[in-house]
A protein has these predicted regions:
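Beta-strand/loop-rich accessory regions of lumenal/periplasmic or secreted enzymes
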Residues: 10, 24-340
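Extracellular and select intracellular beta-sandwich modules with Ser/Thr-enriched
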Residues: 15-22
Length: 340
């Protein structure tokens, strides 16, 4: 980081006030020591797949179609099954260009994605091999559990959500989507978690300190920042999308004792990240802040892409195409989470 600051006081700012800065990322090549394989055990039940390792255990449900439990250090870390998410709350700018009407199928896809043919052999929408859902593959260093979801769109679409569980408690997560002709671009591509509201502090290595978006990040600095989850809710007259963070290498959401979840992404392909007291749907449903529901969860969204917020005008201009996820080709997003 290069920073230019005032050498002396002026009528408009004190000595030391920053007037300009520039940043560049320098890649450091390091040899990565080979990691030892931490032992784990896999249990296949009638309706569940369990994995137990060093200080953790996880449970995947055949009946409910997802990761239903992640215990770390004796504490349950998730409150609901993580879900593929393709929707962000509309902004005032979006209302002018009818984003909800044009892209509304992705809201339904987020709310009502259903695991395909739970516990049965099923064909893919795209043809090809018969799939068991979920699939479970035990490898030398990890267990790979993959779910295939039907998305409530027309024409029909599907996505897969893969969990690779390592013996030390890390879960590498990959969301994959193959394009379907005739569908509008999605506002967001990521995974939504609900954890207990006691996890109320977020720290991240990425752009900050203020919120940033795909088309609102050039004035931000790459660094390590921290704030309260509640402070990421902008005080708009009408609740709408807010609090996003771009270029995130890692982020952790913790309670007052420092316990929580750590999310990491490849530095070469950092993620978008959000930690708020509400889901996009709860924010969208409230026309005034007092209509927001009581806070029960911290809602985490780890995202490969999120549509920008636009703003050329607020009465019809769309977000620029380069800031909208491209769904004309396969889309994949990989990140890792673990308890801390």
């Amino acid at each position: 980081t290069i920073s230019f600051r005032l050498k002396e006081d002026t009528s408009w700012a004190k000595k030391g006030h920053e007037v300009a800065f520039g940043q560049g990322v320098i890649a450091v090549v390091r040899s990565i020591p080979s990691k030892k394989v931490t032992p784990f055990t896999v249990t296949h039940g009638t309706h569940n797949i369990g994995v137990r390792g060093e200080n953790f255990d996880v449970l995947f449900s055949d009946l409910n179609g997802g990761l239903t439990s992640y215990h770390y250090a004796g504490k349950e870390m998730i409150q609901e099954i993580p879900r593929p998410n393709f929707w962000r709350a509309p902004t005032d700018n979006d209302c002018g260009n009818n984003m909800g009407g044009v892209r509304g199928q992705w809201k339904l896809a987020s709310l009502y994605a259903t695991a395909k043919g739970i516990g049965k052999e099923i064909p893919s929408v795209h043809g090809g091999t018969i799939l068991q859902n979920p699939t479970c593959e035990v490898e030398a260093d990890s267990v790979v559990v993959t779910y295939l979801y039907n998305l409530q769109t027309s024409p029909a679409a599907e996505c897969s959500l893969q969990y690779r569980v390592f013996g030390d408690g890390r879960i590498q997560t990959t969301l994959h989507y193959d394009p379907v002709e005739g569908l509008a671009a999605m506002p967001e591509f990521g995974v939504l978690f609900k954890i207990d509201a006691d996890y109320d502090t977020v720290e991240w290595y990425g752009n900050g300190p203020a919120e940033t978006y795909w088309d609102r990040q050039h004035g931000a600095k790459l660094g390590i920042y921290q704030n309260k989850v509640a402070d990421n809710m902008a005080q708009y007259l009408v609740p709408q999308e807010c609090g996003a963070k771009t270029a995130v290498r890692w982020a952790k959401v913790v309670d007052r004792k420092g316990r929580g979840l750590l999310f990491t992404a490849d530095a070469a392909k950092p993620m978008f990240f959000s930690a708020l007291p509400y889901t996009p749907h709860e924010m969208e449903s409230a026309k005034h802040p007092y209509e927001l529901p009581p806070v029960h969860y911290t809602v985490i969204r780890a995202m490969g892409e999120q549509m920008g917020v636009g703003g050329d005008d607020s009465w019809g201009a769309n977000v620029h195409p380069e800031y909208i996820p491209d769904v004309t080709k396969p889309v994949e997003f990989t990140f890792t989470f673990r308890g801390i």
